Amino acid sequence: MRIRLDVRVQDTSAGETIADVAVVGSEADLFDLVSQAGSGLRKKLGVEAVSPVEAVSVRAASPSNREAARLYSEGLARLRASDALAARDLLRQAIAADTKYSLSHSALSEAWSRLGYDKKAQEEARQAYELAANLSPEEKLVVKGRYRDIDQRI
């Protein structure tokens, strides 16, 4: 399926469009389309391009495929709604779809913890910590904090 992604930056007080960009591609390439749109907007706005180090960090902050991203975001939504049981199931599926995505493991650790399974929470927190190398410094701190917190409680 072909899709078109239109992104527009507007000055809301004046109602003027400052910059816009449109990219077209296949649904399977959605993440690449988002990256292309971001690059196009940066160029039009005169903002510096993303460095190779930043690009690695951005890619690490997202699951490697759409299905894993969907399941991860739905799992987070269930966690926020205090439905740890549904979150656990969705996050386990997200991990099956992308075993190397640190933040899915970290979120599953939170779900296990809320369900009272501290050993399972500890294992997922450890896994998240081991996979966190390419995350942004802020995300690394969150993952490390969760791991240290659950490790100290057990």
Where do the model's predicted regions map?
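Acidic, proline/glycine-rich low-complexity intrinsically disordered segments
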Residues: 1-154
